């Protein structure tokens, strides 16, 4: 048997607000949803620009959640499509102690972003692990 424990973290996925919609009212609604959700599950996963639509950073939202809730499990998606390796390493370094895990993925193409050299997600994971950031 893989896991002897009888429990696991059940996470609820939340999309941060679109950058074009971002404002205090939208964030208030988001945090009301998060508060409601956190009472019925023990983890939240924050997405990163689903369908290539620019959104507020999931890591920014995670930091705000962590300020008010020290116990909830937080994970974030991290798109590599529109970032360079230095930016990714900086995001991961700044997230230590805030998020419990990061899902590295290619991400959907964005009409708003110009095509950059595309990183390969598995290579990004290897680099993060080799640099001690995946422990």
Model regions and ranges:
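Active-site beta->alpha loop and helix N-cap motifs at the rims of alpha/beta catalytic domains
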Residues: 2-135
